[in-house]
């Protein structure tokens, strides 16, 4: 077993298969009884309907809304559509997810909001614990960030100064939610320029980034830097480069020709972020955490006895994307179909 600083992985990530009821306040509780987890991000997909029949992907995130109260109403982010992000106010009667609860979440039934609570339909939910909900926008240009604009490991920070040295202005970092234990961070960055660097508040170099513009001008983009035990690599050399594609679209996961300037302390704005001027981007960032997460590349052999990919732990979720060919992202988890042979 790989050495890990994550004592209980289920405190940071859970998978839930559930059924819609069509009724108001459909409370979904996680299956695990050893610990509870209040999620910050929930990715949901219908098992009963394809995307063309209304079974859309939605990423529910409490951090995207500019919330100041205690009620956590999630925004709806559409990963594989160019639809703009749907924001909801402080009313618990709006939005498909009424609340993120102490050990699950509660669904609504009103109108189109019941898209993930249709009676008789089955759904999958992949749920992450980030760093909690920041409740203020950062306006500081140097030194400490505005109080409560960053939440670290569930605690709002009243006087936090980024330790990393970076070139982008501090005022571009509007909100941050970071889980330093599991290695995941959410950021809202606005008005940056290509090449600007910003702290990502994690303990190691990011290996996967999901980016969604605030406007409806593009699908969620996935950037993946291939990793091994010791270094970041690319098949054509040792540069810190990777692969990029739109989330769950049937496009080719192609080589990203640029060298990434991401390091163990900062990440770099890219020329296709569309962040110039007042445009904002939302970033969900992961770094590899031994015993909790693994990001790597393998080569298929075309046989029923396929290659064995070492993770160092028993994964609850495996996401696969074929490189260099038009194919969707594929999700495997420990709750949807569990008939595969388990190899400890």
Please identify what each model-predicted range represents.
Residues 1-344:
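Surface-exposed molecular-recognition determinants
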